[in-house]
Amino acid sequence: MHDLAALTPLGAAAPRTDRAGEISVTEVTDRAIASVSTRNGKAKPFATAAKALFGIEPPAPGLSATGPVWTLIWTGPDQWFAEAPFATHEDIATITKQALGDTASVTEQTDGWVRFDIEGPTAVDMMERLCPLPVRRMKTGAASRSIIEHMGSLVICRAEGRHFSVIAPRSFAGSMHHALMAAARSIA
């Protein structure tokens, strides 16, 4: 029998937190992710089923919405990432698909992405060095696709001016971490 051990996207046994000045960069591994896409002609039944499952309305373009358990992040027309605690939603795709039925297409995404949380009073200064988004004007709940160091990413404002999440393909975890820390050190 194989003796396998789960590793974080950065290749360690536990998530990593690094600090530079007033900024912390934390690898987030306790969230499950599924992509959710409304099926053609199913917008109304999807809206009803989604509200029942998530407890929140799917957000409009450029936004995320957070409820007691779930966070929905707009990723494209009629598409969202659904996040929930990994401890209770390890099988997030099955949970989501069973609740939404034929109103949506659902795909497991947890192991395909890395999430880093950037927190601190100078988070905006750091993010301005990384991506072309107007991060200084982003309000809590704003979400947008962007490019960071040539890597496609999703940037979410969790708390205006001081807490952002960056979600990028897992295969870029090391490169993204390096870019984030270089920017954090540049303002430390």
Regions found by a protein language model. Give the residues of each.
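Basic, glycine/lysine-rich polyanion-binding surfaces/domains
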Residues: M1-A188
